[in-house]
Amino acid sequence: MLTNSLALALLPLTLTLANPLPAPAPADTITIANAGISAADTVPNSYIIVYKSTANDGQIKKYHGEILAKLGKKPVAEFNINGFKAANVVTDAAGLAKVGKNDLIDYIEKDAYVSVSPTTNNTKIFSGPSAQSLVQQPSATWGLGRISHKLRGYFNYIYDTSACQNTRTYVLDTGILIGHSEFQGRAVWGANFIAGSPNTDEHGHGTHCAGTVAGANVGVCKKGTVVAVKVLSKTGSGTYAGIIAGMQWALNDAYARGMQKRSVFSMSLGGSYSSSVNAAVASVVGYGIPVVVAAGNSNLNAASFSPASAPSAITVGASDFWDYRASFSNWGPGLDVFAPGVTILSSWFTCNTCYYYLDGTSQATPHVAGLAAYLIAKEGLSTPTAIVNRIVSLSTKNQVVNALTSPNRIAYNGNGN
């Protein structure tokens, strides 16, 4: 593992010594857990310090006081998610060397960029006087048809009338155009972690994903609520620290509303492998809320990406209309299920009646997040373990072509033939 160290400059000796002096002891080194990450992927001079599970709040507060004394500034963010305790410190390598050695620290990571999973098919924008004029049930999207039938090729969506009623799906993304006609008042603004940005979607990705979760015509959940948690900018990018902050806020919000057993996190985003992001996901799941994440669009093993590699997450790959694994979809034994992710029509951010086609594991993920909320409402499932087990047991087996080492499952709600 690479390490960062401070170089010591020694003045040249002018004396000639018969026996050379021993080399000076090296300066304290700070081990960085993800030191091998590409420099292009890292947020300059930003680190996530993760504390040991034994560190208590008083000890951490004292340590943060030491950071203030040594650096002249406090951590820019502090995290406490069900035993996952961490801080985001902005400083250079010299500053990190001053504060990065403490018995409370479990590990330190470089903060890094995350982004929406890139999409490959932006074919057409639709607009009309109302959502009803665009698509009506039973004339549903092929994705809704696929997750409600054992066989491919259907365009009618079969679902229970509970339809995710009294559930909240937190969409951690670029925000949501909450006034879009698809949501019928069931989209609400939650929190914004992009400094200086407005409380709306400036990119489109979040609105598209939210529509697949809860759109009246293009969504899984006809009666469910989606909550905008803006952690990605108008360029579709964000940071590890911002993602963790968004998860912490959403968890606290769900508990404050007494909705922790009726909530789901949908995270169609990703970056390089991160122990801290995966640990934060595990903490949210440990607190009783399922976290559904995109496998990623690099046609690589999802184990190299986060949060896709988080063992406690429900990791979703993308399949197409013909049940082939999408050519871009990440794969591997860490996936839980595939879902429709090619040529997916959903709500768009440019107007309240606009729609757009996108491809990606980002589009597959909200199908499964919606399914998780659907099962909470329909079957009364109340734990992440029960939800993922039910998704796996219901799934259509051995239909994905070229699943590689992934579990061969397609998401299914248990209704149509």
Question: Can you describe what each PLM-predicted range is?
Answer:
Residues 139-140, 156-189, 197-242, 258-264, ...:
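Subtilisin-like serine protease catalytic core
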Residues 52-57, 92, 113-114, 175-178, ...:
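Acidic glycine-/aspartate-rich tracts in secreted/extracellular proteins
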Residues 21-39, 53-55, 65-143:
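Autoinhibitory propeptides
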Residues 110, 247, 257-350, 389-395:
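Catalytic-core segments of hydrolase enzymes
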Residues 134-137, 154-162, 200-202, 293-313, ...:
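Active-site-adjacent substrate-recognition loops and nearby beta-strands
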Residues 47-50, 88, 107-109, 168-172, ...:
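Structural recognition of the beta-strand scaffold that forms the well-ordered cores
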Residues 1-24:
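Fungal secretory targeting signals
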Residues 210-214, 222-234, 248, 252-253, ...:
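Hydrolase catalytic cores
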